[in-house]
Design a protein with these regions (language model features):
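Amphipathic alpha-helical packing segments from all-alpha helical-bundle domains
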Residues: 66, 110-138, 147-151
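Hydrophobic/aromatic-rich alpha-helical bundle segments in the mid-to-C-terminal region
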Residues: 99-100, 135-182, 191-196
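Helix-turn-helix
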Residues: 6, 14-48, 52
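Hydrophobic alpha-helical connector segments
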Residues: 52, 66-94, 150-153, 172, ...
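Short, basic, alpha-helical segments at the C-terminal edge of helix-turn-helix-like DNA-binding modules
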Residues: 55-62
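Amphipathic alpha-helical segments used for helix-helix packing
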Residues: 90-113, 162, 166
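Short, Lys/Arg-enriched anionic-surface-contact patches
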Residues: 2-3
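Short hydrophobic clusters on alpha-helical segments that form packing/core surfaces
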Residues: 7-15, 57, 88
Length: 196
């Protein structure tokens, strides 16, 4: 592993152990037993390093999204909705997940800017991936009845995540309905008549 990746990994471990506020450049270089000049050779500031750490979490989310996409059953809209809501809950909100300290740090007012960076990166990468794969697959079987697919998915992702953050008690059925209605999916009426 090259030194830059080692610094990112060390910072990530410290953030998960101590939280973001208690992870300093000094703590990182001390744990790695390297000079601060090496840190600054790769990262002009702690903020630049935090951005690189955020990218590792985004990459993991996208890897989970790719796995979800590979396991989707062609034509099974209900199954896809069930599993995507579960994926979002697990990857972004499950406090029993291994990234609990990082998620807790993101949820504080102190880190509101960091949260916005993270969620915008997730929305961008997810929307890009979904449009290039899932929407293309769907379009082979159904009419895609949304214009501006990337922008629609970007806004849907931001909206769903923001809503779930504010309303963690929201039922999966409501979340599935919001997704299906936004994307104009044809669903079985008996399965999609839930009220908000």
């Amino acid at each position: 592993m090259d030194r830059k990746l080692e610094i990112i990994q060390c910072a990530r471990e410290l953030i998960e152990e101590r939280g973001l506020a208690k992870t300093s450049v000094a703590a990182i270089t001390e744990r790695m037993n390297v000079a601060r000049t090496l840190f600054y050779h790769y990262f002009p500031s702690k903020e630049d390093l935090v951005a690189a750490v955020l990218d590792t979490y985004v990459d993991e989310f996208i890897a989970s999204l790719k796995e979800w996409n590979a396991q989707r059953v062609e034509g099974d809209i209900e199954g896809a909705l069930d599993t995507i809501v579960a994926l979002i809950r697990d990857q972004l909100f499950d406090n029993d997940n291994a990234h609990k300290p990082f998620r807790r740090a993101l949820a504080t007012h102190e880190n509101a800017s960091l949260y916005l960076q993270f969620i915008n990166r997730v929305a961008d990468a997810s929307a890009t991936y979904i449009v290039e794969t899932t929407v293309a697959d769907y379009g082979r079987l159904h009419e895609v009845r949304i214009d501006h697919a990337y922008e629609t998915f970007y806004m849907l992702i931001l909206g769903i995540v923001g809503y779930m953050r504010q309303h963690p008690e929201a039922s999966d059925d409501v979340l599935k309905d919001i997704i299906a209605q936004t994307l104009h999916f044809e669903r079985e009426r008996e399965q999609s008549h839930h009220t908000a």
